[in-house]
Amino acid sequence: MYDEILSAFFEVNDELQSEARCGEKNDRCKTNQDCCSGFRCTKFRRCGRR
């Protein structure tokens, strides 16, 4: 039971962290995971539209 609660907490926390990173479309990135959904890491290492 505690494992389920912790798992749910970390999933929500990851989601909030990713939303926190989504403020700017030109955020620096290394991989597509560093960008929010709908954006990808461009060759200039900035989050841009897909």
From Swiss-Prot:
One example GO MF annotation: ion channel regulator activity
A cellular component annotation (GO) from this entry: extracellular region
Major subcellular site: secreted
Summary of the tissues where the protein is detected: Expressed by the venom gland.
Keywords: Disulfide bond, Ion channel impairing toxin, Knottin, Secreted, Signal, Toxin
Compartments it resides in: Secreted
Disulfide bonds: C22-C36, C29-C41, C35-C47
Family according to the record: Belongs to the neurotoxin 10 (Hwtx-1) family. 64 (Jztx-20) subfamily.
Function recorded in the entry: Probable ion channel inhibitor.
Entry remark concerning the domains of this protein: The presence of a 'disulfide through disulfide knot' structurally defines this protein as a knottin.
Name by which UniProt lists this protein: U23-theraphotoxin-Cg1a 2
Organism of derivation: Chilobrachys guangxiensis (Chinese earth tiger tarantula)
Taxonomic path: Eukaryota, Metazoa, Ecdysozoa, Arthropoda, Chelicerata
